[in-house]
Amino acid sequence: MEIERINEHTVKFYMSYGDIEDRGFDREEIWYNRERSEELFWEVMDEVHEEEEFAVEGPLWIQVQALDKGLEIIVTKAQLSKDGQKLELPIPEDKKQEPASEDLDALLDDFQKEEQAVNQEEKEQKLQFVLRFGDFEDVISLSKLNVNGSKTTLYSFENRYYLYVDFCNMTDEEVENQLSILLEYATESSISIHRLEEYGKLIISEHALETIKKHFAS
């Protein structure tokens, strides 16, 4: 994937269809399956944020152009008006001359509703994490700490170990406390669980930390 930072509010990136398939997505389903296309978009935006420090805040203006061998995507963040009272989308001059099918306020309202829905989905997803380890010894060290209450699955992918953690039925405080322990031995990864399931190697399907402790941490 190629990323180009246009300015403070705009970033452009190009993804070949090979890039898309390498991430575990089918080139056809991204057009017809909204859930999967959004999953791909936010996975890519996480990488854009890491590489370009492009934080996604507020409504977005998104242009997608289908090319012969991939997609070119331009993402622009809405900006506050000079009086600080209204969000404005920096639409290019050539687009402003085209007949608008919707009033800008209505368009922004739709963006805000979409953003609220995304935020709610992200809040729910924050009960699940993918963690990357430097080596297997770090996984063993973590298993000795008796981190309980979460569901854990271990994968290997591209010579790294990844632990999928599901903090189901845990309070925000419990999640925060356990995550702080986990992050002493691992780093949070932007790789999705779907990509690990598709391209990674499943090592331990459930109770991963308990199993590792039983066999390696005696």
From Swiss-Prot:
Any matching Pfam family: MecA
Magnesium is among the record's keywords: no
Record has Cell division as a keyword: no
InterPro entries: MecA_C_sf (IPR038471), Neg-reg_MecA (IPR008681)
MF terms in GO: protein-macromolecule adaptor activity
Alphabetically ordered keywords of this record: Competence, Sporulation
Similarity-based family: Belongs to the MecA family.
Assembly with partners or alone: Homodimer.
Task of the protein: Enables the recognition and targeting of unfolded and aggregated proteins to the ClpC protease or to other proteins involved in proteolysis. Acts negatively in the development of competence by binding ComK and recruiting it to the ClpCP protease. When overexpressed, inhibits sporulation. Also involved in Spx degradation by ClpC.
Free-text comment about domains: The N-terminal domain has binding sites for ComK and ComS and probably for unfolded/aggregated proteins; the C-terminal domain interacts with ClpC.
HAMAP family membership: MecA
Name of the protein: Adapter protein MecA 1
Organism field: Bacillus subtilis (strain 168)
This protein's encoding gene: mecA
